[in-house]
Amino acid sequence: MLTNPSQVIIRNQETLSQHRVLVLNHEADSLPKALLDVAQSVDALALDYHHYLHLAPQANAKLRCYFGHQLPHQDKYDTVIVYFPKAKPLAPYLFNLAAQHLVADGQLLVVGENKGGVKSLVKLLPKYFATGVKLDNARHCLLFGSSIIDTAPEIKLSDWTSQYQLATPQGNITICNLVGVFSEKHLDQGTELLLSHLPTLSGRVLDFGCGAGVIAAALLKAQPTLSLECIDINAMALASCELTLAANGMTAKVYPSDGLAQTSGKFDGIISNPPFHDGLASTTSIAQSFVADSAKQLQSKGIWQIVANRHLPYSDTIAAEFGQLTVPAENNKYKLYSFQQA
């Protein structure tokens, strides 16, 4: 099943006949493979690890699948398709990336849902692209076309990074935040509650849903000998976390994981302000899987501690998996859940 934006691309696929195509920020469907009906070859770069895992099994000699914030090569393409991102500040970065990979007379296609901000494309396109032209309007989506008219600057992550000092209970740390990664530039209430009651940890520790690396840097500030692993599904978050750790002179293993599926072995500590705050059925299911998998991957005497919105129904799930559970701290919005393995 193709998403609505992908269906709009298929409606206009005749423009891709025998083209070398690059798809940036694709969704969790098979659009890149479907384009092989007309295209010479397709490369697809996912910025969401779930989307990459969905497509990767379909890779073949003409379809290459990648995950990350950039491609591992400098290949050029006749057409670059950009899915307009949910995080609007990420859009100019994707356009800059597209420009690096377009041949001189290549075409840029940008597709997105009307409610997702794609209507503002004309204002967001950098000056090295021609004014965006509306090519289609269907499935509650818009498709725009453009082309390169000037040399685009090379991508330097520093140009797309906001760097700032953050005061934490463990001391001041430097945060590096790439475009498209959530940041309030101060400690949110949930993270502050978690960091204010950090347990003493040792050995191998996991930061689940690491984001830009706030919790990771605070952990290593207080306990620099930890063997820390940081996981997330968002490529820009993972790159931000790596930059944050480097800016603070810290090291950790940073990698993508779908839940805990790409981790291995057991941990002496699992710490998280998990991204499960909206209460939707989909994220509630992910949260329940995280809790269940955590219980299996905690060493004897291992410590598990997360902070969560107090109105979300996680208490029963956590209690069912861990049994003996403590709530060492809470406020009017968040609860801190803690467990130590027997």
From Swiss-Prot:
One of its GO terms (cellular component) is cytoplasm. GO terms for molecular function: 16S rRNA (guanine(1207)-N(2))-methyltransferase activity; nucleic acid binding. Its main location: cytoplasm. Signal peptide: none annotated. Transmembrane segments: none annotated. It catalyses: guanosine(1207) in 16S rRNA + S-adenosyl-L-methionine = N(2)-methylguanosine(1207) in 16S rRNA + S-adenosyl-L-homocysteine + H(+). It is found in: Cytoplasm. CDD domains: AdoMet_MTases (cd02440). It comes from the Bacteria. Its EC number is 2.1.1.172. Coiled coil: none annotated. Keywords: Cytoplasm, Methyltransferase, rRNA processing, S-adenosyl-L-methionine, Transferase. It is an enzyme of class 2 (transferase). Specifically methylates the guanine in position 1207 of 16S rRNA in the 30S particle. Belongs to the methyltransferase superfamily. RsmC family. Monomer. This is Ribosomal RNA small subunit methyltransferase C. It comes from Shewanella sp. (strain MR-7). The lineage of its organism: Bacteria, Pseudomonadati, Pseudomonadota, Gammaproteobacteria, Alteromonadales.
